[in-house]
Amino acid sequence: IIIIDKVLEECTYNSKGLVLEKLSYLKEKDFLKAAKVPYKTDSLIAPSPAKLLRQLENQFVNNIVRRQKELTDTEFENQKNSFLNDADMKQIILCLNLIKNGEQVVLVTEETESSNDNKLFKKIPAICKELEIETMTLPELIAKYDGIDVDFQ
């Protein structure tokens, strides 16, 4: 299980930091150092950057939303760059790199492929489907692997 820096960062402000409150070890410096968490993504590059950019502009964009928002080319480029640097795309880029290196990868997400909430870019499962990256929800992952046990208090 890999936790990237962008996801850990989002955990601090999503749901008032509930994840970090319940999983307090994710704030403990000794644990973070020993577990090599979080995975740093600041210099993470896609295996084929030009191809990914083309896919982002052509396949992963919600063109209906793009037209509705009447974005200029500059505005679109700014939003595309923001999306490339957010947690969703960093997870996807990491998965692409791991797959390239022969790793078996599953991206765990609670997002669904369909609901897009009027966002400019598609959700993780839709992008992963195009890129042939397997996705699962946390309950699906727990059901698949017998050794995983979760205790809710």
Residue ranges, per PLM feature:
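Active-site-proximal, substrate-binding regions of enzyme catalytic domains
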Residues: 1-105, 113-114
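Acidic, metal-binding active-site segment of PIN/NYN-like and related structure-specific nucleases
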Residues: 86-150
